[in-house]
Protein backbone atom coordinates (compact mmCIF):
# COMPACT_ATOMS: atom_id res chain seq x y z
CA UNK A 1 0.00 0.00 0.00
CA UNK A 2 1.21 3.51 -0.79
CA UNK A 3 1.02 5.66 2.37
CA UNK A 4 2.26 8.95 1.00
CA UNK A 5 1.31 10.97 4.10
CA UNK A 6 2.74 8.53 6.64
CA UNK A 7 5.59 9.98 8.73
CA UNK A 8 7.02 6.47 9.29
CA UNK A 9 6.94 4.75 5.89
CA UNK A 10 5.67 5.42 2.40
CA UNK A 11 5.06 1.80 1.39
CA UNK A 12 3.46 -0.80 3.65
CA UNK A 13 3.38 -4.53 2.92
CA UNK A 14 0.47 -6.10 4.82
CA UNK A 15 0.15 -9.65 6.06
CA UNK A 16 -1.96 -11.77 3.77
CA UNK A 17 -5.43 -12.96 4.75
CA UNK A 18 -5.43 -11.73 8.36
CA UNK A 19 -7.69 -9.52 10.49
CA UNK A 20 -6.47 -6.07 11.46
CA UNK A 21 -8.77 -5.77 14.44
CA UNK A 22 -9.08 -7.72 17.74
CA UNK A 23 -11.34 -10.64 16.77
CA UNK A 24 -13.65 -12.09 19.40
CA UNK A 25 -12.54 -15.68 18.93
CA UNK A 26 -15.42 -17.01 21.05
CA UNK A 27 -17.74 -16.21 18.15
CA UNK A 28 -15.75 -18.57 15.93
CA UNK A 29 -15.13 -21.43 18.38
CA UNK A 30 -17.71 -23.77 16.81
CA UNK A 31 -16.87 -22.85 13.24
CA UNK A 32 -14.57 -24.62 10.84
CA UNK A 33 -12.88 -21.59 9.28
CA UNK A 34 -10.90 -19.56 11.79
CA UNK A 35 -9.58 -16.01 11.41
CA UNK A 36 -6.00 -15.08 12.17
CA UNK A 37 -5.23 -11.78 13.84
CA UNK A 38 -2.53 -9.66 12.25
CA UNK A 39 0.72 -9.16 14.09
CA UNK A 40 0.17 -5.40 13.78
CA UNK A 41 -3.13 -5.71 15.63
CA UNK A 42 -1.54 -7.78 18.41
CA UNK A 43 1.35 -5.35 18.79
CA UNK A 44 -0.87 -2.24 18.73
CA UNK A 45 -4.04 -3.08 20.70
CA UNK A 46 -4.76 0.61 21.24
CA UNK A 47 -4.68 1.49 17.52
CA UNK A 48 -8.43 1.64 16.96
CA UNK A 49 -9.34 3.51 20.19
CA UNK A 50 -6.66 6.11 19.45
CA UNK A 51 -7.80 6.44 15.84
CA UNK A 52 -11.42 7.08 16.82
CA UNK A 53 -10.34 9.47 19.57
CA UNK A 54 -8.24 11.57 17.20
CA UNK A 55 -10.79 11.59 14.37
CA UNK A 56 -13.58 12.61 16.74
CA UNK A 57 -11.48 15.57 17.91
CA UNK A 58 -11.20 16.70 14.31
CA UNK A 59 -14.80 16.07 13.33
CA UNK A 60 -13.83 13.30 10.94
CA UNK A 61 -15.56 10.03 10.13
CA UNK A 62 -13.82 6.66 9.80
CA UNK A 63 -14.53 4.30 6.93
CA UNK A 64 -13.13 0.81 6.51
CA UNK A 65 -12.42 -1.71 3.78
CA UNK A 66 -12.28 -5.46 4.04
CA UNK A 67 -11.64 -8.18 1.48
CA UNK A 68 -14.18 -10.99 1.77
CA UNK A 69 -13.84 -14.05 -0.47
CA UNK A 70 -10.35 -13.31 -1.79
CA UNK A 71 -8.15 -14.95 0.83
CA UNK A 72 -5.30 -17.21 -0.23
CA UNK A 73 -4.38 -18.08 3.37
CA UNK A 74 -7.86 -19.49 3.96
CA UNK A 75 -7.86 -21.14 0.55
CA UNK A 76 -4.64 -23.01 1.28
CA UNK A 77 -5.84 -24.04 4.74
CA UNK A 78 -9.32 -25.10 3.59
CA UNK A 79 -9.01 -25.97 -0.12
CA UNK A 80 -12.46 -27.56 -0.31
CA UNK A 81 -14.02 -24.15 0.45
CA UNK A 82 -12.55 -22.66 -2.72
CA UNK A 83 -14.00 -22.20 -6.18
CA UNK A 84 -13.19 -25.26 -8.31
CA UNK A 85 -12.98 -25.05 -12.09
CA UNK A 86 -14.33 -27.63 -14.52
CA UNK A 87 -11.18 -29.74 -14.12
CA UNK A 88 -11.53 -29.90 -10.34
CA UNK A 89 -8.64 -27.52 -9.68
CA UNK A 90 -9.00 -25.45 -6.52
CA UNK A 91 -8.77 -21.70 -7.09
CA UNK A 92 -7.01 -20.96 -3.81
CA UNK A 93 -7.41 -17.20 -3.89
CA UNK A 94 -11.24 -17.30 -4.10
CA UNK A 95 -13.58 -18.88 -1.57
CA UNK A 96 -16.84 -20.11 -3.09
CA UNK A 97 -19.97 -18.09 -2.17
CA UNK A 98 -22.02 -21.32 -2.32
CA UNK A 99 -19.99 -23.03 0.41
CA UNK A 100 -21.87 -23.04 3.76
CA UNK A 101 -18.65 -22.84 5.81
CA UNK A 102 -17.64 -19.76 3.85
CA UNK A 103 -21.04 -18.13 4.33
CA UNK A 104 -21.01 -18.79 8.07
CA UNK A 105 -17.47 -17.48 8.42
CA UNK A 106 -18.12 -14.27 6.50
CA UNK A 107 -21.36 -13.50 8.36
CA UNK A 108 -19.60 -13.99 11.69
CA UNK A 109 -16.52 -12.04 10.66
CA UNK A 110 -18.48 -9.03 9.43
CA UNK A 111 -20.76 -9.06 12.47
CA UNK A 112 -17.71 -9.19 14.74
CA UNK A 113 -15.89 -6.49 12.79
CA UNK A 114 -18.83 -4.09 12.94
CA UNK A 115 -19.22 -4.81 16.67
CA UNK A 116 -15.56 -4.38 17.57
CA UNK A 117 -14.84 -1.44 15.28
CA UNK A 118 -17.66 1.17 15.08
CA UNK A 119 -16.95 2.36 11.54
CA UNK A 120 -19.10 4.97 9.82
CA UNK A 121 -18.91 3.03 6.55
CA UNK A 122 -17.50 -0.32 5.47
CA UNK A 123 -16.59 -1.26 1.90
CA UNK A 124 -16.85 -4.98 1.13
CA UNK A 125 -14.59 -6.23 -1.64
CA UNK A 126 -14.71 -9.55 -3.53
CA UNK A 127 -18.04 -10.79 -2.20
CA UNK A 128 -18.43 -12.88 -5.34
CA UNK A 129 -17.03 -15.38 -7.81
CA UNK A 130 -13.88 -13.54 -8.85
CA UNK A 131 -13.20 -15.23 -12.17
CA UNK A 132 -10.08 -16.77 -13.65
CA UNK A 133 -8.77 -13.49 -15.07
CA UNK A 134 -8.11 -12.07 -11.61
CA UNK A 135 -5.48 -14.75 -11.09
CA UNK A 136 -2.92 -14.85 -8.29
CA UNK A 137 0.43 -13.02 -8.05
CA UNK A 138 2.88 -12.62 -10.95
CA UNK A 139 1.23 -15.19 -13.18
CA UNK A 140 2.92 -16.22 -16.40
CA UNK A 141 0.45 -16.47 -19.26
CA UNK A 142 2.30 -17.40 -22.42
CA UNK A 143 -0.84 -18.04 -24.43
CA UNK A 144 -3.31 -15.22 -23.94
CA UNK A 145 -6.88 -16.26 -23.24
CA UNK A 146 -9.98 -15.07 -25.04
CA UNK A 147 -12.95 -13.74 -23.11
CA UNK A 148 -14.78 -17.01 -23.71
CA UNK A 149 -11.91 -19.12 -22.40
CA UNK A 150 -11.66 -16.95 -19.31
CA UNK A 151 -15.41 -17.28 -18.71
CA UNK A 152 -15.35 -21.06 -19.06
CA UNK A 153 -12.41 -21.36 -16.67
CA UNK A 154 -14.25 -19.14 -14.19
CA UNK A 155 -17.37 -21.31 -13.76
CA UNK A 156 -17.35 -23.06 -10.39
CA UNK A 157 -18.06 -26.78 -10.26
CA UNK A 158 -17.44 -27.40 -6.57
CA UNK A 159 -19.75 -29.86 -4.82
CA UNK A 160 -21.93 -27.09 -3.40
CA UNK A 161 -22.36 -25.25 -6.70
CA UNK A 162 -23.21 -28.50 -8.47
CA UNK A 163 -25.72 -29.38 -5.76
CA UNK A 164 -27.40 -25.98 -6.10
CA UNK A 165 -27.49 -26.41 -9.88
CA UNK A 166 -29.11 -29.84 -9.57
CA UNK A 167 -31.69 -28.38 -7.17
CA UNK A 168 -32.64 -26.00 -10.00
CA UNK A 169 -33.01 -28.90 -12.43
CA UNK A 170 -29.67 -28.31 -14.16
CA UNK A 171 -27.51 -31.24 -15.25
CA UNK A 172 -24.29 -30.03 -13.63
CA UNK A 173 -22.21 -32.97 -14.87
CA UNK A 174 -23.30 -32.35 -18.46
CA UNK A 175 -22.48 -28.66 -18.09
CA UNK A 176 -19.04 -29.56 -16.75
CA UNK A 177 -18.41 -31.87 -19.70
CA UNK A 178 -19.53 -29.12 -22.08
CA UNK A 179 -16.92 -26.81 -20.57
CA UNK A 180 -14.26 -29.53 -20.98
CA UNK A 181 -15.22 -29.98 -24.62
CA UNK A 182 -15.33 -26.29 -25.47
CA UNK A 183 -12.00 -25.54 -23.80
CA UNK A 184 -10.38 -28.47 -25.63
CA UNK A 185 -11.71 -27.20 -28.95
CA UNK A 186 -10.59 -23.65 -28.23
CA UNK A 187 -7.07 -24.82 -27.40
CA UNK A 188 -6.80 -26.51 -30.81
CA UNK A 189 -8.27 -23.72 -32.94
CA UNK A 190 -7.76 -20.02 -33.45
CA UNK A 191 -10.60 -18.16 -31.75
CA UNK A 192 -11.17 -15.09 -33.92
CA UNK A 193 -11.72 -11.55 -32.73
CA UNK A 194 -15.19 -11.61 -34.32
CA UNK A 195 -16.18 -14.73 -32.38
CA UNK A 196 -14.91 -13.21 -29.16
CA UNK A 197 -16.95 -10.06 -29.80
CA UNK A 198 -20.00 -12.21 -30.52
CA UNK A 199 -19.58 -13.90 -27.13
CA UNK A 200 -19.48 -10.53 -25.36
CA UNK A 201 -22.56 -9.30 -27.27
CA UNK A 202 -24.66 -12.46 -26.93
CA UNK A 203 -23.51 -13.33 -23.40
CA UNK A 204 -25.42 -16.41 -22.17
CA UNK A 205 -27.26 -16.75 -25.47
CA UNK A 206 -23.88 -17.74 -26.94
CA UNK A 207 -24.37 -21.15 -25.29
CA UNK A 208 -27.81 -21.97 -26.72
CA UNK A 209 -26.33 -24.98 -28.52
CA UNK A 210 -25.07 -26.33 -25.17
CA UNK A 211 -28.36 -26.81 -23.25
CA UNK A 212 -26.86 -27.88 -19.92
CA UNK A 213 -24.41 -24.99 -19.88
CA UNK A 214 -27.00 -22.51 -21.15
CA UNK A 215 -29.32 -23.52 -18.29
Question: How should each PLM-predicted stretch be described?
Answer:
Residues 48-53, 110-114:
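Generic structural signal for well-ordered alpha-helices
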Residues 1-43:
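Aromatic-lined carbohydrate-binding/catalytic grooves of carbohydrate-active enzymes
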Residues 8-25, 75-86, 137-139:
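Short, flexible, mixed-charge acidic loops at enzyme active sites
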Amino acid sequence: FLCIRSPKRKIYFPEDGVAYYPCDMKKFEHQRIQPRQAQFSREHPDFWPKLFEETEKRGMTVSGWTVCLHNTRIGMAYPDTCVHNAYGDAVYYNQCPSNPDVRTYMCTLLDDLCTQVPLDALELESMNFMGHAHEYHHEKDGIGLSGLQDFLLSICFCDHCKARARAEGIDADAAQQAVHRMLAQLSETQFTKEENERFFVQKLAFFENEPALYA
